[in-house]
Amino acid sequence: MDQLIQLVEASEARNDFPAINPGDTVKIQLKVIEGEKERLQAFEGVVISDRGAGGSKTITVRKISHGVGVERIIPVNSPNIESITVLKHGKARRAKLFYLRKRTGKAALKVKARKVVEKA
């Protein structure tokens, strides 16, 4: 039974997204259906948590919109995700960045930048 579950998860897993870690600033293009029309909606923010593995992996993204903190839990393997772009890699010393919830203004999105070395 366990092998069957692994086969199903492996077949549904999406590998077309970059590696996402807590502290990264990401821009996610989501498909939104309104009536008969379908459009893309961008959600840009800091990844404060990732959870699960394989087909059940989710990330929590937080942004500040008009002075109000907005968090969205996004299943990474959802068919409603068009693309995920990592805008900035952040250096986080924690696995969960829930302390950002208590911060206001620019400090709420401030995570130290991480140097990324491209392999040649």
From Swiss-Prot:
Function (record text): This protein is located at the 30S-50S ribosomal subunit interface and may play a role in the structure and function of the aminoacyl-tRNA binding site.
Gene: rplS
Keyword check for Ribosomal protein: yes
Pfam hit, one: Ribosomal_L19
Molecular-function GO term, any one: structural constituent of ribosome
NCBIfam families recorded: rplS_bact
Entry similarity comment: Belongs to the bacterial ribosomal protein bL19 family.
SUPFAM superfamilies with a match to the protein in the record: Translation proteins SH3-like domain (SSF50104)
Record protein name field: Large ribosomal subunit protein bL19
GO process annotations (BP): translation
Swiss-Prot/TrEMBL keywords: Ribonucleoprotein, Ribosomal protein
Organism: Chlorobium phaeobacteroides (strain DSM 266 / SMG 266 / 2430)
HAMAP family: Ribosomal_bL19
GO cellular component, one term: cytosolic large ribosomal subunit
Coiled-coil annotated spans: none
